[in-house]
């Protein structure tokens, strides 16, 4: 019983760092396996070999038939199943303790570098480092692997029990094996009680397997949801995504304020050709409103505009520019 108590204490530590389904699984493991096996299992199978009676006087025949009927005792088989199923959980516990100690050492190094931190605050940090560890990263991989192996062991032991014993305890077992000279009938004590106990343990194993499968689905959904949250901030194309996975609309782009805000550039209409522009530029030159830098900008704008409007308009506009220049200058000085 001391071994059971030690294992129970270890699994209690695992329960603090498990999911909700994992806690239910551990509860089922404690109540319906450890307690039932320790209290009722041994009492049901105590007379298993002593009350196994065969209708023969052949020496050694009864022992051989019992070995054929029960290659391993049901209670020992269930204890072995319990140990195999609990082993991945204990490995997860070891990994968790290792990570907690590692985090505790890192916190100690950080606290040693801080002189102003009080000793009470350090003890609070140390106590919280071993009790509050989130299941993520390598710990999540270890936890998921332990659940997978628990499911494999549960299914394997269920198949093994069906192959070795079946799920019903027959009251009569027919044996034909050396040194028995003929077929021997052997009688099992309390077959109905043992059948009920076998079915009960079968249901517990099925519930445990179902909980493991549900926990795998829960962990898969949790990892998938975590991946969506990580990919919500950016996408391969550089367009941000929202929480629902839809692309967010691009932000409107506003031109930065220009350094030459005091210069009013003339507007140009492409439909009016080059006459309108030449008249405006001549007026600005006469009145002295255009700066040298603006003239360069205007000439560059006029060159682009003339090219856009077409090369044939250049020749026809040259005479008009000269005549407009002469008339505008005369009218200004008169």
Swiss-Prot record:
The record ties this protein, via InterPro entries, to: Connexin, Connexin_CCC, Connexin_CS, Connexin_N, Connexin_N_sf
Q: In which tissues is it expressed?
A: Resides primarily in the ovary, oocytes and early embryos.
Instruction: Please give one Pfam family short name.
Output: Connexin
The protein's superkingdom reads Eukaryota
Give the stretches traversing the membrane: 13-35, 76-98, 154-176, 208-230
Task: Give the GO cellular component terms, alphabetically.
Answer: connexin complex
List UniProt keywords, sorted A-Z.
Cell junction, Cell membrane, Gap junction, Membrane, Transmembrane, Transmembrane helix
Can you say where in the cell this protein is located?
Cell membrane; Cell junction, Gap junction
Alphabetical GO biological process terms: cell-cell signaling
Q: On the Cytoplasmic side, which residues?
A: 1-12, 99-153, 231-334
Q: List all topological domains (Extracellular).
A: 36-75, 177-207
Q: Its topology with respect to the membrane?
A: Multi-pass membrane protein
The GO terms describing molecular function are: gap junction channel activity
Keyword Transmembrane helix, does the record have it? yes
Instruction: Tell me the SMART domains matching this sequence.
Output: CNX, Connexin_CCC
What is the stated purpose of this protein? One gap junction consists of a cluster of closely packed pairs of transmembrane channels, the connexons, through which materials of low MW diffuse from one cell to a neighboring cell.
Describe, as the record does, how this protein assembles with itself and its partners. Answer: A connexon is composed of a hexamer of connexins.
**Listed name of the protein:** Gap junction alpha-2 protein
Output the lineage of the source organism.
Answer: Eukaryota, Metazoa, Chordata, Craniata, Vertebrata
Q: Which gene encodes it?
A: gja2
């Amino acid at each position: 019983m001391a071994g059971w108590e030690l294992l129970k204490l270890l699994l209690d530590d695992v329960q603090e760092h498990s999911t909700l389904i994992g806690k239910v699984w551990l509860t089922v493991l404690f109540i319906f396996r450890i307690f039932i096996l320790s209290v009722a299992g041994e009492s049901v199978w105590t007379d298993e070999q002593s009350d196994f009676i065969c209708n023969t006087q052949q020496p050694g025949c009864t022992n051989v038939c019992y070995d054929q009927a029960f290659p391993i005792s049901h209670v020992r088989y269930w204890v072995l199943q319990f140990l195999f199923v609990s082993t991945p959980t204990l490995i997860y516990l070891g990994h968790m303790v290792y990570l907690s100690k590692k985090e505790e050492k890192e916190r100690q190094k950080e606290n040693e570098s801080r002189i102003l931190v009080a000793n009470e605050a350090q003890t609070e940090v140390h106590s919280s480092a071993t009790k509050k560890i989130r299941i993520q990263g390598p710990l999540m991989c270890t936890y998921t692997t332990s659940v997978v192996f628990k499911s494999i062991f549960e299914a394997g032991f269920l198949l093994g029990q069906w192959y070795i014993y079946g799920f019903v305890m027959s009251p009569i077992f027919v044996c034909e094996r050396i040194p028995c000279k003929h077929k021997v009938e052997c009688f099992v004590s309390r077959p109905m009680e043992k059948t009920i106990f076998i079915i009960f343990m079968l249901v517990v194993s099925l519930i445990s397997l179902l909980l493991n499968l549900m926990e795998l689905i829960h962990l898969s959904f949790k990892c998938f949801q975590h991946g969506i949250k990580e990919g919500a901030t950016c996408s391969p194309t550089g367009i941000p995504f929202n929480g629902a996975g839809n692309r967010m609309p691009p932000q409107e782009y506003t031109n930065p304020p220009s350094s030459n805000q005091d210069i009013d550039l003339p507007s140009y209409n492409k439909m009016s050709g080059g006459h309108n522009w030449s008249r405006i530029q001549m007026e600005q030159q006469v009145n002295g409103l255009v700066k040298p830098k603006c003239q360069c900008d205007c000439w560059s704008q006029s060159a682009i505009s003339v090219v856009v409007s077409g090369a044939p308009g250049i020749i026809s506009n040259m005479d008009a520019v000269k005549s407009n220049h002469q008339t505008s200058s005369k009218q200004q000085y008169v």
